[in-house]
């Protein structure tokens, strides 16, 4: 799968137009438009979209009526599902 024509966030902390080549559930390559490889296979047009790395929420108490302090495993599951839905891959309760 290739996501092309998308703005990717670079290590230089800038967005550049380019694409992402996926190999299963792994990122194989991120490229700038000027260095785009020949696109074969499934190509998704990312026009108008931005791609950023997964985020880490360093200070989080809860959401949607659930709180870590409740100590409820089901609530923690709902919190984790919500965070994943908005691009957060890791979170810490302090």
Specify the residue positions occupied by each region the protein language model found:
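Conserved small/polar residues in nucleotide/adenosyl-binding loops
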Residues: 93-94
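N-terminal metal-binding scaffold of metallo-dependent hydrolase/deaminase domains
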Residues: 1-37
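Short acidic/polar active-site loop segments enriched in Thr and Asp
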Residues: 88-90
């Amino acid at each position: 799968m290739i996501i092309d024509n998308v703005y990717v966030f670079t290590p230089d902390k800038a967005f550049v137009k380019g694409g992402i080549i996926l190999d299963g559930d792994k990122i194989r390559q991120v490229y700038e438009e000027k260095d785009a490889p020949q696109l074969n296979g499934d190509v998704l047009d990312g026009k108008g979209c931005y791609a950023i790395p997964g985020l880490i929420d360093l200070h989080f108490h809860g959401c949607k009526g659930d709180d870590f302090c409740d100590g409820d495993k089901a609530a923690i599951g709902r919190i984790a599902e919500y965070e994943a839905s908005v691009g957060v891959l890791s979170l810490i309760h302090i």
